[in-house]
């Protein structure tokens, strides 16, 4: 649920994280650092960001240490950048502010051109806050966990690009749900419901909802439809056939799943706290990002 903060003491130490693989990211990041420092805040850069853009005037720390020293993290990039740092900060008391320097920007919802107007007030303690859930998943082979990871958006089991459909047996809370022949299956958080799950035909879940959504990817049976399940459910996806299937945890991948492998997915106890400008509204974000308020013109442009 989104809540408005009362006036509190300003955040003292601000961590900066950037989409350092993007062209021309150094100048806006350094501009942002100067703006924040000029208002009396201490600055620390995420280490990979600092190394890749050549930061020398500010200290740099790896994400785990950054979480211990910073009071808030400001992410300049797209949603993918925020997903990555969000996993590192999950469970820590460091909230995250997203400034868009990517494309769509559902979570990095502050346009860079507006940052000088809204960020000072947010760092001074005036913001809207919400808590987002994550997924915890393990890959189990012969009763041994061979891989585990957190996912902010989704856990996706995919067929190989060189083979046909993958066959999956899906159970929820120990109860068999179905066998499925498809290109894969998405297990999504409410946050991830506006990502891959949406493009695969899944519903949008408001972030305040306590639920998970299972979305088949191009299922062979048209009756295999998306389903929303309780947030505390445990989902087990067993690969029954299919060559070189893979599983993706947001942007982290494990390839070459074997028949018999089980992917166990449940809601993580860790959460991420996102901060937005005062007046933030989720429905306005959907309307803007998905162009709900626009209609095609005669030349088929929005």
UniProtKB/Swiss-Prot annotation:
Residues of the active site: 79
Cited Pfam families: NAD_kinase, NAD_kinase_C
Kinase recorded as keyword: yes
Membership in a protein family: Belongs to the NAD kinase family.
Gene Ontology CC: cytoplasm
Record lineage: Bacteria, Pseudomonadati, Pseudomonadota, Betaproteobacteria, Burkholderiales
Reactions catalysed: NAD(+) + ATP = ADP + NADP(+) + H(+)
Name under which the protein is recorded: NAD kinase
UniProt organism field: Ralstonia nicotianae (strain ATCC BAA-1114 / GMI1000)
Positions of disulphide bridges: none
Subcellular location: Cytoplasm
Source organism superkingdom: Bacteria
The keyword Transmembrane helix is annotated on this UniProt entry: no
